């Protein structure tokens, strides 16, 4: 069991390197073993065990292999959403494909893509999602001041119009469960109809992921510092 866990940690670190995620934080300290909740499997760091590849059907094997594919790097390896989807590959395979399209093929500036993800993670208080994407957002050029507005739930002031529109839209969508006409009109003015649909789909995709992470109590990788403060 211990050897499997070490392999998974190593593979997830390699995946983060392949994705261009900064490794400064992990490299600056020696990981320490933490005590997991009693219902958490150490090899998956969630409430679900990590299936062996040979026990999966053909679709499950495709999902498994895609996680290890260097052409499709994940931020978390098997100790994250991908590990959860191995238990339902019929749902997981198309969901992961939609995530890939939204992240890589939809024409949205990378910093705004990551901002939309972070707004979603903050509104769902998803520690795993936030901690995975904060370094990516900064790498993609998101202003740290904008990041802090989302992180600490500050009022939006003196922010660029695109960032302001996304933050207001996401907060109303998830916090208020409705979007005011004037907020929608501003999104439409700034981005146009197609982009508003794509941004909404991106946020919905990560809201779905946040729910899955919460249900199965996905823990951070061993030695990973949580980056999202809880009120």
Question: What role is predicted for each listed range?
Answer:
Residues 17, 23-231:
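Hydrophobic alpha-helical segments
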Residues 1-3:
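Positively charged n-region of N-terminal signal peptides that target proteins for export
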Residues 5-15:
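Bacterial N-terminal signal peptides
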């Amino acid at each position: 069991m211990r050897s499997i866990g070490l392999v998974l940690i190593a593979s997830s670190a390699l995946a983060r390197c392949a994705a261009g995620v900064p490794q400064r934080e992990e490299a600056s300290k020696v990981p320490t073993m933490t005590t997991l909740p009693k219902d958490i499997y150490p090899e998956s760091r969630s409430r679900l065990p990590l299936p062996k590849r040979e026990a999966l059907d053909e679709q499950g094997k495709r999902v498994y292999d895609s996680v290890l594919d260097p052409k499709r790097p994940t931020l978390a390896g098997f100790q994250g959403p991908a590990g959860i989807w191995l238990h339902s590959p019929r749902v997981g395979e198309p969901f992961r494909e939609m995530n890939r399209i939204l992240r890589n093929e939809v024409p949205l500036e990378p910093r705004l893509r990551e901002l939309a993800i972070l707004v979603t993670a903050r509104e769902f208080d998803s520690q795993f999602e936030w901690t995975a994407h904060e370094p990516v957002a900064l790498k993609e050029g998101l202003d740290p001041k904008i990041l802090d507005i989302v992180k600490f739930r500050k009022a939006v002031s003196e922010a660029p119009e695109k960032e302001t529109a996304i933050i207001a839209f996401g907060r109303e969508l998830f916090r208020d469960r409705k979007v005011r006409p004037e907020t929608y009109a501003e999104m439409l003015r700034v981005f146009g109809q197609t982009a508003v649909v794509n941004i909404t789909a991106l946020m919905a995709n990560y809201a779905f992921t946040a729910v899955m992470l919460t249900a199965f109590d996905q823990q951070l990788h061993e030695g990973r510092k949580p980056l999202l403060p809880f009120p």
